[in-house]
From Swiss-Prot:
UniProt PTM: Methylated by PrmC. Methylation increases the termination efficiency of RF2.
N5-methylglutamine: residues bearing it: Q252
Source taxonomy: Bacteria, Pseudomonadati, Pseudomonadota, Gammaproteobacteria, Lysobacterales
SMART domains to which the protein is assigned, alphabetical: PCRF
Keyword Protein biosynthesis attached: yes
Protein name: Peptide chain release factor 2
GO MF annotations in UniProt: translation release factor activity, codon specific
Family to which this protein belongs: Belongs to the prokaryotic/mitochondrial release factor family.
Length: 374
C-alpha cells in the first residue's frame, strides 16, 4: 500500500487554494448574480431586446465557469477525501491511485481558476478593438503591420473568437498603413491588453534589391468595447465627421461606396474609422463604438500615468513602449518585459502567442498590476 499522508496533504492544500479563490472571486455574490441572470433568461420577454439577451447569455456563461467550477472542485475534493479513507481502511492501492489521478484533474482546474484571477479588471471580460499602425519606414513597415494583423487574426481564430475587420488602409506598394479589427470572445480585452506597445521587426527586407537588414516598427493599441452600462461622455460638438470612399486592402469585406466614416475627437485628436458596414449610418454607429472604446482606454492610461511617475515619463502614453523584438534573420522573438524568447518565429507569426501573452499576464499580476482598472 502506498503512503497516503502526502495524498491527504495534497487534498488539504488544494482545498485551501480553492477556498482562497472563493473569497477572491466573491463567490457568494457571483452565485447570487448567476441565479438572477438565469431567471432573467427564462423570461419569455427577454428576447424583445436581443442585444441585452445575448449580453446576459455571455454573462451567464462566464459566471458559470467561476461558480460551477469552484463548487465542482470543492465537491470533488470532499469525495476524494472519502475515497482515500476507504482505500486506507481496505488497504486498496488501486483506489488510492485513482484518488491521485482525480487530484491531478482537480489541480488543473484550480490552476485555471487561479489564472482567471488575472481577469479581475472592470473591462477584462469585454470584447476588444485592436488598432495596428505602421511606423516610419515605408513599404517595409507597412508589410510588417500586415504581418502583425494576420498574426492577431490567426491567434484569435485559434481561440475560437470572432473577428471583424472594421477599417483598413492599404500600403502604397504592399502591406497596410493601419487597420482596426474587432475581436469578440471570452475575456478578449483581458487577454489582449498586454499587447499594447511597439513591436520591432529586424530582417533582410524582401523589398530591398541589395537584401540589406532593415528595422521597422509597428504600434499596437487595444481598447475594450464599451457597453451601455459604462458612461463615456462624448460631446457631439467635439467631433468632426468625414465621409469617404473605402479603399485599400479588405477585398469583398469592404464596402466600396462612399459610405465609409472617419470621426475625429478634436480634444484628444483621437481618430477612428469604419468602412465595413453596408451603409453610412451603420459605419457611423460602429465608429462611435470604437471611439468610446478608445477614449475609455486612453482615460485608463491617463490615470495610470498620474498614479505612477514612471508611466508619466513615457514618450507617448497612447501607444505605450517597445514590448517585443522580432529578429527574423536570427530566428529569435523576444519579449522585452518578461524575457520569454522563441526561435520558432514562423509559428509565432502564424498566431502561436499564448506563451507570450500568459507570461505578460502573470508578470502583471505578480507586480500587482499598474492598471487602475485591474
Amino acid at each position: 500500500m502506498i503512503e497516503t499522508n502526502p495524498i491527504r496533504q495534497r487534498i488539504t492544500d488544494l482545498n485551501d487554494r480553492v477556498l482562497s479563490l472563493r473569497g477572491i472571486f466573491d463567490y457568494d455574490a457571483k452565485k447570487e448574480r448567476l441565479e438572477e441572470v438565469s431567471r432573467e433568461l427564462e423570461s419569455p420577454d427577454v428576447w424583445n431586446d436581443a442585444e441585452r439577451a445575448q449580453a446576459l447569455g455571455r454573462e451567464r456563461s462566464m459566471l458559470e465557469k467561476t461558480v460551477i467550477g469552484i463548487a465542482d472542485v470543492l465537491s470533488g475534493l470532499a469525495d476524494a477525501g472519502d475515497l482515500l479513507e476507504l482505500a486506507e481502511s481496505e488497504q486498496d492501492e488501486d483506489t488510492a491511485l485513482a484518488v491521485i489521478a482525480d487530484l491531478d484533474n482537480y489541480q488543473a482546474h484550480v490552476e485555471k481558476l487561479e489564472f482567471q484571477r488575472m481577469f479581475s479588471g472592470q473591462m477584462d471580460s469585454a470584447n476588444a478593438f485592436v488598432d495596428i499602425q505602421a511606423g516610419a519606414g515605408g513599404t517595409e513597415a507597412q508589410d510588417w503591420a500586415e504581418i502583425l494583423l494576420r498574426m492577431y487574426l490567426r491567434w484569435a481564430e485559434s481561440r475560437g473568437w470572432k473577428t471583424e475587420l472594421m477599417e483598413v488602409s492599404g500600403g502604397e506598394v504592399a502591406g497596410i498603413k493601419s487597420a482596426t479589427v474587432r475581436i469578440e470572445g471570452e475575456y478578449a480585452y483581458g487577454w489582449l491588453k498586454t499587447e499594447i506597445g511597439v513591436h520591432r521587426l529586424v530582417r533582410k527586407s524582401p523589398f530591398d534589391s541589395d537584401n540589406r537588414r532593415h528595422t521597422s516598427f509597428t504600434s499596437v493599441f487595444v481598447s475594450p468595447e464599451v457597453d451601455d452600462n459604462i458612461e463615456i461622455d462624448i460631446n457631439p460638438a467635439d467631433l468632426r465627421t468625414d465621409v469617404y470612399r473605402s479603399s485599400g486592402a479588405g477585398g469583398q469585406h469592404v464596402n466600396k461606396t462612399e459610405s465609409a466614416v472617419r470621426i475625429t475627437h478634436i480634444p484628444t485628436n483621437t481618430v477612428v474609422a469604419c468602412q465595413t458596414g453596408r451603409s453610412q449610418h451603420q459605419n457611423r454607429d460602429n465608429a462611435m463604438k470604437m471611439l468610446a472604446a478608445k477614449l475609455y482606454e486612453l482615460e485608463v492610461q491617463k490615470r495610470n500615468a498620474e498614479k505612477d511617475a514612471l508611466e508619466a515619463t513615457k514618450s507617448d502614453i497612447g501607444w505605450g513602449s517597445q514590448i517585443r523584438n522580432y529578429v527574423l534573420d536570427q530566428s529569435r522573438i523576444k519579449d522585452l518585459r518578461t524575457g520569454i524568447e522563441r526561435s520558432d518565429t514562423q509559428k509565432v507569426l502564424d498566431g502561436d502567442l499564448d506563451e507570450f501573452v500568459e507570461a505578460s499576464l502573470k508578470a502583471g499580476l505578480a507586480a500587482g498590476s499598474k492598471r487602475l482598472d485591474a
